[in-house]
C-alpha cells in the first residue's frame, strides 16, 4: 500500500503501550521537523479528525488535569454497566462531545467527563475555542468525498480484504501475547470485534457484519466532524468523474495558490 513512499508513525509502538492525542502530536511534530529539514512537504493522511485538528491548530491540552479517583470511578461504571451507560452520562453534561465520541471509545468518554468534572466546562467548548486559533502551519486540508452508497461499498470491500489478509490470525496472535479489549491498541475497528469472535461472543460472520456496520458509522461521524472544520477543502470524487489524475491536478493547483509548493 505504501508504493515506495516513505511513511511515518507505522509499527512504532508495542500493542501494550499507551497512545493518546498528546503523544500523537508530540511524535508527529518531531517528524514534521525532520521532513521540513529535508526540504520536503509533509502529507498528513488519516481519518481521525480530532488528531488532525490537534496537530494543525496546536491545541493546548495542559488544562486537562487528572483526577485518578474520579477516573477509576468512571472505569468501574463502564465495567459494571457498560460503555453505553457511561456514554449516556456524557450525553447529559456535554451533548456535543457525546455526538463526536463513539460510546466504545471509553478512554475519550472518560477524558471528556473528567475535564467537565475538574473544570466545570464542556470539553467540546474548550476544543471549539482552541479550533479558532490560527494554525502555525501553511496547509491545505483536503477531504475526499463520494456518494454514500459507493463509500459503503468501498468499506465492505476493505473489510473483506482485511479478513483475507489475515486479521483473525493477527488478533489471535495479539491475544496470545496478553492483549485484552481494555488496551487502546485493541479498540481499533476490527480488533475488538474479532476479539469478541475469538472469545466465543459471536460467529465470524457476525463479527464481519459488525465491523462493516461500525466502520460505516465511523465514516459518517468523521464526515460530520470535517463539515465543522473551517479550513476543509472538499473534493467530490463523483464531480471529477472518478479521475484520480484530475483530482491530483486540482490539488496541486490549490497547493500552488497557497504557495505551499512552487510552480514548476
Language model: regions and residue ranges:
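Phosphate/pyrophosphate-binding catalytic cores of soluble transferases and nucleic-acid-acting enzymes
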Residues: 1-264
Amino acid at each position: 500500500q505504501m508504493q515506495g513512499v516513505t511513511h511515518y508513525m507505522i509499527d512504532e509502538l508495542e500493542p501494550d503501550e499507551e497512545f493518546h492525542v498528546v503523544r500523537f502530536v508530540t511524535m508527529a511534530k518531531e517528524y514534521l521537523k525532520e521532513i521540513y529539514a529535508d526540504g520536503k512537504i509533509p502529507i498528513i493522511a488519516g481519518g481521525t479528525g480530532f488528531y488532525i485538528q490537534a496537530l494543525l491548530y496546536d491545541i493546548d491540552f495542559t488544562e486537562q488535569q487528572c483526577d485518578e479517583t474520579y477516573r477509576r470511578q468512571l472505569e468501574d461504571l463502564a465495567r459494571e454497566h457498560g460503555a453505553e451507560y457511561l456514554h449516556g452520562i456524557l450525553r447529559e453534561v456535554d451533548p456535543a462531545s457525546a455526538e463526536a465520541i463513539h460510546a466504545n471509545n471509553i478512554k475519550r468518554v472518560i477524558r471528556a467527563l473528567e475535564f467537565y468534572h475538574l473544570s466545570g466546562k464542556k470539553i467540546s467548548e474548550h476544543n471549539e475555542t482552541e479550533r479558532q486559533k490560527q494554525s502555525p502551519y501553511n496547509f491545505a486540508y483536503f477531504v475526499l468525498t463520494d456518494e454514500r452508497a459507493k463509500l459503503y461499498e468501498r468499506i465492505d470491500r476493505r473489510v473483506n480484504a482485511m479478513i483475507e489478509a489475515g486479521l483473525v490470525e493477527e488478533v489471535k496472535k495479539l491475544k496470545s501475547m496478553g492483549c485484552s479489549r481494555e488496551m487502546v491498541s485493541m479498540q481499533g475497528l476490527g480488533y475488538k470485534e474479532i476479539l469478541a469472535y475469538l472469545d466465543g461472543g459471536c460467529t465470524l460472520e457476525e463479527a464481519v457484519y459488525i465491523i462493516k456496520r461500525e466502520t460505516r458509522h465511523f465514516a459518517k461521524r468523521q464526515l460530520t466532524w470535517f463539515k465543522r472544520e473551517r479550513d476543509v477543502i472538499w473534493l467530490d470524487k463523483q464531480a471529477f468523474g472518478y479521475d484520480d489524475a484530475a483530482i491530483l491536478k486540482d490539488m496541486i493547483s490549490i497547493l500552488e495558490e497557497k504557495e505551499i509548493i512552487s510552480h514548476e
